[in-house]
């Protein structure tokens, strides 16, 4: 297998463009050389300026307690530079120590400092798990997302203008409302069509939260993201979704049991909508490869790989419909104020069986039916308000698409068929362990700390 150190750039066949690996990203300090091999550094690693290649080599060597032997006739005198750094591991490690790399920094490393899920998991664990090394992904997986047998390719990329609109939508959709009665949620360059609130005001997030979130807009998504970055961004969106829900005044006025129940039932749809709006396209082949390498249960791996098809189908439809930010907001409201709990998918039934989880934990949808909503009529009214807002907006902005409203509602129904178990396994299982996403976001919502 060819090392990725010598070829940071890879050609993505699907998009016919160069995809930069993490080593070729904007983190590279072209004016500061690596003290080990003199390649471009990417910042300080273990006490010195070093490139990702040497930093990764040092980390692996220390964590695995490697004892290398120099095979050269001139013991310990091998050249360690960008060209020859992989030829003698013993001399490379020796030079790492000579230039000042600190092995204690590796031993006490606590994983990515900006890990969203790890920050929130601190509520449940006194010590956070160390960041395990990402398995080396074969080039054929990186370059061809259809490499898995029978696995479909990625969704077609959005046109350039539409993609820029999607990235701009994050900040545009979260601007403070211009007035108490009208909120403009249109994307850039779309004619101004203000969305009027229903009498319940579900489009009324608090101004303080909107101002704070507007200053934390995510950077544009690259054409293809590495699996680790996808998971991190997915976690960020998961908790941003919860914060968005907390900012909806009509929702927070419901009894707390109703809020928690609706949150538990809608987190999956919110996650799918966020992934479609802000994180397309995705390399599912990378995600599955990493998941398979980390999971010894072949039965679960097989089920997750099969269920990813449904997830991708929904993302494909959402992508191809060119949904703007206002429509996304309406779809979120429709998903949030659901009149009845969605039916569990077959995979979720399996996930709740002792075969997969070792426990017979009840399905959240089943418990929803037994508990019911305390303010069911109010929730139903807000659901109707959201549907009417979407219908009225589409009538004004897409008069030549009479079926668009029903098509979008159909996608909402299709989202119900995506397995929340698969999403949890693929994006979050390694980090959250045995704790369910439902419990995690519900506890955080209740404590009002995210």
Swiss-Prot record:
Chief localization: nucleus
Q: Name one GO molecular function term.
A: DNA-binding transcription factor activity, RNA polymerase II-specific
The Swiss-Prot or TrEMBL record marks DNA binding at: 31-108
Protein origin, superkingdom? Eukaryota
Which key words are in the record? Answer: Activator, Developmental protein, DNA-binding, Metal-binding, Nucleus, Receptor, Repressor, Transcription, Transcription regulation, Zinc, Zinc-finger
Zinc fingers, NR C4-type class? 34-54, 70-96
Q: What is the residue range of the signal peptide feature?
A: none
- Give the source species: Drosophila virilis
Write out the annotated subcellular location: Nucleus
Encoding gene per record: tll
Q: What is this protein called?
A: Protein tailless
Q: Name one GO biological process term.
A: insect visual primordium development
* GO cellular component, as recorded: nucleus
- Spell out the subunit comment: Monomer.
Asked whether the keyword Cell inner membrane is assigned, the reply is: no
């Amino acid at each position: 297998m060819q090392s990725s150190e010598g070829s940071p750039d890879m050609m993505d066949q699907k998009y016919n463009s160069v995809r930069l690996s993490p080593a070729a990203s904007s983190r590279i300090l072209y004016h500061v050389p690596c003290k080990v091999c003199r390649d471009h550094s990417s910042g300080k690693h273990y006490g010195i300026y070093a490139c990702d290649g040497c930093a990764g080599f040092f980390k692996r060597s220390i964590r695995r307690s490697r004892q290398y032997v120099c095979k050269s006739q001139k013991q310990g005198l091998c050249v360690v530079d960008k060209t020859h750094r992989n030829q003698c591991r013993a001399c490379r490690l020796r030079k790492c120590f000579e230039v000042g790399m600190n092995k204690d920094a590796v031993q006490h490393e606590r994983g990515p400092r900006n890990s969203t899920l790890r920050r929130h998991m601190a509520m449940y664990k006194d010590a956070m798990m160390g960041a395990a090394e990402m398995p080396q992904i074969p080039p054929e997986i990186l370059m061809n997302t259809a490499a898995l047998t029978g696995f479909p390719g990625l969704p077609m990329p959005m046109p350039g203008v539409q993609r820029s609109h999607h990235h701009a939508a994050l900040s545009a959709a979260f601007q403070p409302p211009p007035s108490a009665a009208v909120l403009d949620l249109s994307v850039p360059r779309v004619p101004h069509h203000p969305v009027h609130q229903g009498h319940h005001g579900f489009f009324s997030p608090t101004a303080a939260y909107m101002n704070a979130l507007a200053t934390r807009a995510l950077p544009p998504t690259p054409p293809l993201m590495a699996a680790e970055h996808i998971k991190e961004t997915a976690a960020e969106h998961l908790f941003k979704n919860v914060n968005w829900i907390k900012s909806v005044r009509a929702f927070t006025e419901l009894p707390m049991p109703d809020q928690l129940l609706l949150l538990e039932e809608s987190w999956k749809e919110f996650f799918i909508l966020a992934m479609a709006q802000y994180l397309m396209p995705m390399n599912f082949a990378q995600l599955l490869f990493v998941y398979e390498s980390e999971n010894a249960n072949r039965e679960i791996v097989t089920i997750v790989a099969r269920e990813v098809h449904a997830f991708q189908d929904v993302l494909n439809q959402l992508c191809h419909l060119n949904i703007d930010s206002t429509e996304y907001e309406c779809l979120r409201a429709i998903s949030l104020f659901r009149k009845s709990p969605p039916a569990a998918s077959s995979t979720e039934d399996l996930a709740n069986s002792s075969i997969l989880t070792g426990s017979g934990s009840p399905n959240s949808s089943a418990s929803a039916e037994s508990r019911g909503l305390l303010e069911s009529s109010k929730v139903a009214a807000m659901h109707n308000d959201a549907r009417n807002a979407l219908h009225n907006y589409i009538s004004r902005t897409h008069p030549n698409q009479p079926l668009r409203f029903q098509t979008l509602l159909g996608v909402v129904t299709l989202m119900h068929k995506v397995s929340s178990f698969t999403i949890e396994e693929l994006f979050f299982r390694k980090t959250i362990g045995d704790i369910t996403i439902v419990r995690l976001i519900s506890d955080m919502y209740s404590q009002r700390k995210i």
